């Protein structure tokens, strides 16, 4: 049964790809209206076990997020070509698949819930029990 945790090689290549993609997305001019002036943060790159597919999680900091993701996927082959010099040690250049990173929104939602008066009251009751017990 295969392990679900990524290997050291997957993690290392994913991090190298993340850095290379960040540079390309920051410096390249991809003549697409959805990407004009868009600031895009590459938060994570997950490599498949065979290193042929890279799932790229991005956070557009401005603009229409869905349109930006669609544009990145349309330009994936161009981006792949621009990233290839930075990953020249690889036997096969991975296929990039761009997805919206929602981890920050999830973090904000959980933080809001934890700060709500109901949860604060319940957490306060638990602290009182710990002090008495």
Curated annotation (Swiss-Prot):
- Describe the task this protein carries out: One of several proteins that assist in the late maturation steps of the functional core of the 30S ribosomal subunit. Associates with free 30S ribosomal subunits (but not with 30S subunits that are part of 70S ribosomes or polysomes). Required for efficient processing of 16S rRNA. May interact with the 5'-terminal helix region of 16S rRNA.
The record's listing under PROSITE patterns reads: RBFA
Q: Which UniProt keywords apply?
A: Cytoplasm, Ribosome biogenesis
Q: Looking at the keywords, is Cytoplasm present? A: yes
The keyword Aminoacyl-tRNA synthetase appears for this protein: no
Gene3D superfamilies, alphabetized: 3.30.300.20
For this record, the Gene Ontology CC terms, alphabetical, are: cytosol
Which family would the database say this protein is a member of? Answer: Belongs to the RbfA family.
Per the record, the GO terms for biological process are: maturation of SSU-rRNA
Subunit structure of this chain's protein: Monomer. Binds 30S ribosomal subunits, but not 50S ribosomal subunits or 70S ribosomes.
Give one GO term, molecular function aspect.
ribosomal small subunit binding
Reading the lineage from the top rank, the first entry is Bacteria
What does the organism's lineage look like at the top? Bacteria, Pseudomonadati, Pseudomonadota, Alphaproteobacteria, Hyphomicrobiales
Q: Which gene encodes it?
A: rbfA
Q: Where in the cell is it found?
A: Cytoplasm
The protein's name: Ribosome-binding factor A
What SUPFAM superfamilies does this protein map onto? Answer: Ribosome-binding factor A, RbfA
